[in-house]
Amino acid sequence: MIYYLSYIRNGGQFMHTFLIVLLIIDCIALITVVLLQEGKSSGLSGAISGGAEQLFGKQKQRGVDLFLNRLTIILSILFFVLMICISYLGM
């Protein structure tokens, strides 16, 4: 993969633009997925009174929450990989 990136680095304006477009799409998707997730805290009143239930209660994520959590992890990893590739091509 490093050889491929160094090959593209020499004449890779198209690849650089393509990776930037992928990064923008990934950023928009990551922001959307994070905003779709349910809040895990009750705000300030939950921190004062009802925080023990969240701390000691074990609730597993199911369904949509689990899917959004995993999708957030995947999109975050993709974000960092794209950033590393773009910075390598920019050298």
Swiss-Prot record:
Q: Which Pfam families does UniProt cross-reference here?
A: SecG
Example of a GO biological process term: protein transport by the Sec complex
Which UniProt keyword terms apply here? Answer: Cell membrane, Membrane, Protein transport, Translocation, Transmembrane, Transmembrane helix, Transport
Q: How does it sit in the membrane?
A: Multi-pass membrane protein
Membrane spanning segments where? 16-36, 71-91
The record's subcellular locations are: Cell membrane
Q: What GO molecular function annotations does the UniProt record carry, in alphabetical order? A: protein-transporting ATPase activity
> Which GO cellular component terms, listed alphabetically, does the Swiss-Prot or TrEMBL entry include?
plasma membrane
* Consequence of gene loss (knockout): Grows normally, a double secG/secY2 mutant enters stationary phase earlier. Significant differences in the export pattern of a number of extracellular proteins are seen in a secG deletion; the double secG/secY2 mutant exacerbates this effect (shown in RN4220). Single or double deletions are as virulent as wild-type (shown in RN4220 and SH1000).
Q: InterPro entries per the record? A: SecG (IPR004692)
| Subunit note | Component of the Sec protein translocase complex. Heterotrimer consisting of SecY, SecE and SecG subunits. The heterotrimers can form oligomers, although 1 heterotrimer is thought to be able to translocate proteins. Interacts with SecDF, and other proteins may be involved. The channel interacts with SecA via subunit SecY. Also part of the accessory SecA2/SecY2 protein translocation apparatus required to export cell wall protein GspB.
Q: Which family does it belong to?
A: Belongs to the SecG family.
**Which function does this protein serve?**
Subunit of the protein translocation channel SecYEG. While not essential, it considerably increases the export efficiency of extracellular proteins.
Protein name as catalogued: Protein translocase subunit SecG
Q: Which species expresses this protein natively?
A: Staphylococcus aureus (strain NCTC 8325 / PS 47)
